[in-house]
Regions:
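Core transmembrane helices of Major Facilitator Superfamily
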Residues: 30-33, 115-127, 150
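Paired small-residue
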Residues: 95-96, 107-115
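Intracellular juxtamembrane helix-capping segments at the cytosolic ends
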Residues: 44, 122-135, 142-143
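Residue-level signature of mid-helix packing/kink "hotspots" within the transmembrane helices
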Residues: 35, 63-71, 155
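C-terminal ends and interior cores of transmembrane alpha-helices
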Residues: 91-104
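Helix-to-loop junctions at the C-terminal end of transmembrane segments
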Residues: 68-82
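Helix-loop-helix hairpin linking two adjacent transmembrane segments in secondary transporters
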Residues: 150-167
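Helix-breaking motifs and short loop linkers at transmembrane-helix boundaries and internal kinks
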Residues: 49, 81, 102-107, 136
């Protein structure tokens, strides 16, 4: 299929809807790192008595690394391709969840937060960036749907995570 984007005819990849769907799934998978964080704060404090302020620093580290390192992650996408960057981002997120489960000090929690932020930023930035690239003719639709995956992931999993923590 061909579309005219800003006056230029461009060939649209036939697999772009599949790729968009994969991007949404990836966003669903990383959502609870950010939107589900508050579910973990009180249980962590009750177990370790680190204080809410100290524990919340982990979230600040996560948000900082998730957002401010995206330009560097974008460089990696340009150099090595989106599949590798998303895969490595997913691996970092998985490692961070494991470290979180084993964290016995704030410094370990902070390391996990940094790794989670780097991984989530790699996934988020790459998926949104590629949605824009694959859907130059429907940028708002593609980026909105991809970003909605982030919110949908939280909406679908917050209650089960809360129940799991309470069990």
């Amino acid at each position: 299929a061909h579309r005219t984007v800003a006056g230029a005819a461009t060939a649209l990849p036939p697999y772009r809807y599949f790729q968009l769907g994969l991007g949404v799934v990836c966003m669903v998978m990383i959502a609870n790192l950010q939107y589900g964080w508050n579910l973990f704060v009180d249980p962590i404090d009750q177990q370790y008595h680190w204080g809410r302020a100290g524990i919340q620093w982990a979230f600040s580290i996560f948000v900082f690394t998730e957002t401010w390192l995206v330009p560097i992650e974008g460089w990696f996408v340009d150099r090595f391709g989106p599949a590798l960057v998303v895969a490595l981002g997913g691996i970092l997120v998985a490692i961070a969840w494991v470290i979180d489960s084993l964290a016995d000090s704030l410094s370990v929690l902070y390391v996990a937060a940094a790794l989670a932020g780097i991984g989530a930023g790699a996934v988020y930035g790459t998926c949104v960036g590629n949605a824009l690239k694959w859907f130059a003719d429907r940028r708002g639709f593609a980026s909105g749907l991809t970003a909605a995956g982030f919110g949908a992931g939280a909406a679908a999993t917050v209650v089960p995570v809360r129940e799991f923590i309470a069990a």
